[in-house]
Amino acid sequence: MAHNDTIDIISSSPEFPDISVLVAKAASKKSALRTGSNATPIPSDAVGLGTFTSAASIWHLSQVMDEEKPTKNSSSRPAKETPAIATSVSTVAVEVSATTTTAVSEEKPGKKPRKPRKKKDETTAAVDENAPPKPPARRGRPPKQKDVEGQPALPKSKATKPAAKPRASRKKAETVSKHFAASAHASTADPPEEPSKNPAASKPPKPIPVQNIDEPVDLEPAARRRLDWTPPPDDRPPPAAGNSSVVKELPSSTTAHTEPPVAFGKLLDTYGCEPETIQPSEGTKGNVLGKRKLIEMVATTTTTNTATDKLTSPETSPTKPKAPKKKPRTITDLATAAYRIQDPVDDSISTVAPKQDTLLGYIDVEDEDAAVKPGGAKTKAVSKKPAKARVSKKKPEPRKQLLLSPHSALRQVSGQNFVFGTSSQLVTEDTDLLRALHESMKTAGNAQESDPFMSSPVKFSNIASRSKMGNNKLWRVGARDEDGDLLDLEIFDLTEAVEVPEDVVQQADKPAVDVPEREASPRKQVEREAERAIGIFSSDPVATERLTITGPETLISTLSIKGKESVRRTTKSPPPNPVAPPRERTPQRARPPSRDSLSSRLRSPQTETSPRPTTPPRVSAVLDLDYDFDDYEPPPSNQEHYQLLEQSQKTSPSKTQQRKQQQQQQQQQQQQQKKRDPPPRPKYEVFTDAQLSREIASYGFKPIKKRAAMIRLLEQCWESKTGAATGKSTGLGDNTLQEGTGSLEPAHRSINSVAVSPDRGRGQTIQGAHMQEARAGIKMAASATKRPRKKAAVASASAPRTSTMENPPKAATAASTSTTTAPLPALSASTSKRQRRTSLSSIRPRPPILEIPDSDIDISDSDPFASSPPVSSPDASPPASQLFSTPEKHHQDHKHDLAAEMSLITDCEESLLDMTSRTPSEADLFKHITEAITTAPRTTNPSEPSWHEKILMYDPIILEELTAWLNTAGKGLDRVGWEGCEAGTEEVRRWCESKGVGWVWREGNRGQVRKRF
């Protein structure tokens, strides 16, 4: 019966190929998933290798897992073995048959007792022999039971969907833990991790020789890496080189060794616990990097590399540069180092200070090194640079900061060396020059207080250094005279001078026989001579224009760089200037001056009579340099030069001052003479508009726009002021005019008989009957000359006149404005029309071109009527004929031009002239008009403002409307109590002009403005 049982087992064996076929089909679909990006490439020479590992490694892992864990459940193991076997690239038939028999042997113990296990070897052999004929022999039910048992592997490979139905219906599927099922789905790369752990399953791979070859290659390196690279996420954050190697080896068989023990636990470790593993990795990695850097730094600085130095030096290194004492290396530090107050330095600190100056000193720490390192190492570091510390101790202590007095501060500044400023411009390759300049500055500071700019002579041993001072452009260009004008000195090139024989130089060195030696202060005498020359040049306007200096022959002698070359230029002086008086000169010879500045070397040497040159020479001066270099000092600055000029002015006044004094004396004499004689009439046509308006305001009149009206009014006022004193001069002009006209006596008598009180102030009213007569005369002249003046404006284009010249208007105008000595041409009735036209056309060819006066000219300080203005004074140069570019005849007959220009006066100016003839009744009327307008009630309608509001808003006042309002009962003049006659438009117009109110006439029918009534 037992034999029959075995036969039954054999009869059921043909069903096993069906299982392998199903597994093979599932594996064929599964291979597409395993050959993705995560699958490792399989070499072409590999034999028996799957997608992840070889068959030998699978059997070896099964043995290892059997040792670590007992067999828990054999039902799920064949499901994990079959995919790995099916997915192999080159599957050997022997290996497949072996695995299938093991799967069958593992499934049978679940149904039958374990007794028939002893015959497994026989069954496997039978199955291997009958492997090809198994597929055709199939039966219904027995294979279904075995398919159900092997079904749990199908969901893992995701091969077929209908396999899920028997999985839920069978009770055997529940024996598989959910954790294992999840691990089977999650990690597809771990099918060979848990093979069958039965001892029978581990027996077949032993005869395979490939297992012994792969064991030392795959297993041993994996164990070493697990020890060295203990959590894998440690090396992930930084891009280290080691991480790339780890990533490359993850899909290898070594990863299978680290993760397989617990599939579900490994999933949580690799994905859920990454943040916990990163924190310890940062600490360990920082320590490693810190140690490496510390080892490199300590190796360069010290000889002893101890563990304590490695730990302490990185912590204390940032606190080390707190007290480094460096030397000042910038320009500001160098300039302020001498004035900085330094703290006292101890000896202990000074010994360590040299260490901080070098780069090695920044690595070691003073306090911790002294505590950790032995004493011998410390003394060696200090003994390396002992000399540097001693040099720093020998530096002089800085002076205490004190508030010095001005004298002591100047003395201290004079003792300092110039690092910047003008002295740096003089620095050349020759250092003797700068050294000599400093010495001269120091000696100048110790001079006497009476003459602070006097300094002791400085000896120059080197001629080259002396010659460098000859090109001081700043002082020469900036030299100015007492009036503030620049000196136009001639520039000489000392480098390209002509060589002079020795005998000439020796002869020049000899002192002059006829010139006495200079006494106590030779410098002042030289300065006086220089100031005299400067005064000649600056005070003479003609000499300034011609750029010449009147005087004797000037000899210019200069030395070159070598001291043997010189330039001598001789210029013949012209005869004495006709404008400026000749100046006495002391016969002198060119003698080298001692201790004189560059700006004060203008001298007048030997005098000789010579003919006048054809061309005016340039301004020349003698620039005599010291031949023996015994006495020399640097040229003074502009400030010093100005002080020297002030001192020279105190001792010897210049020609300009003498000339000013003479002018003052002449003015005093003229004033005294004017008191006795009548003053000459001022030339108002020469005055500017501003001067004319100022003179008119001094008489109390309002400003006038037209220039001719201002001149006419001033002349009338001047005639009324002088009174009878001017009767003679005006009488001459009247007689000449009366010969032709004979009808101007009433007007001129009324004008000339007026006298004004001389002591009245500005703005005071003219009192007395004389002023009334003057007003009447002015009004007569203005009213009588309205029409003729209007016609005279176009006299050249108008029709020829008849005997209208006998009328008084033109003659009265000419007579009132004629005060010059030249007589007017007699225009009698017998004069022909052509002669009159030519005389008038010659009178007004063009108006005079007046020069715009300078702001310095101010005539208000002196009496404008006492004398003529400075530009028109007879003793001034040039005369008025040269000042104004007009013909001489025009200036002689300027009153004719003035008469012609008066014809351009408009009605506005005439009305201003009529203001002077205001009667008391008109003044009272104007007062009531002002009161009526200002006291009128304010309007409540913004569109109709009152007259006062219109005036305040600068609205033009219509004369007809204002006159009608003033004459309205109960509104204008009637409201303020005016009892006189009604106001007319002409009176209202004059009131507006007196108050400066803008007025207009109402337009006529043709759209034109009516000017007169």
UniProtKB/Swiss-Prot annotation:
A Pfam family matched in the record: Slx4
GO biological processes: DNA recombination; DNA repair; DNA replication
Bias type Basic residues, positions: 381-393
Region entry Disordered, spans: 63-263, 300-329, 374-401, 502-541, 555-686, 755-895
Chain intervals with Polar residues compositional bias: 242-257
Biased composition range(s): Basic and acidic residues: 221-237, 511-532, 674-686
One GO CC term on file: Slx1-Slx4 complex
Listed GO MF terms: 5'-flap endonuclease activity
Subcellular location: Nucleus
Keyword line: DNA damage, DNA recombination, DNA repair, Nucleus, Phosphoprotein
Low complexity bias spans: 86-104, 152-166, 300-320, 589-620, 647-672, 811-832, 862-881
Post-translational modification: Phosphorylated in response to DNA damage.
Main localization of the protein described in the UniProt heading: nucleus
Domain of life of the source: Eukaryota
Complexes and interactors: Forms a heterodimer with slx1.
Similarity remark: Belongs to the SLX4 family.
Protein function: Regulatory subunit of the slx1-slx4 structure-specific endonuclease that resolves DNA secondary structures generated during DNA repair and recombination. Has endonuclease activity towards branched DNA substrates, introducing single-strand cuts in duplex DNA close to junctions with ss-DNA.
Protein name: Structure-specific endonuclease subunit slx4
Species: Neurospora crassa (strain ATCC 24698 / 74-OR23-1A / CBS 708.71 / DSM 1257 / FGSC 987)
Species classification: Eukaryota, Fungi, Dikarya, Ascomycota, Pezizomycotina
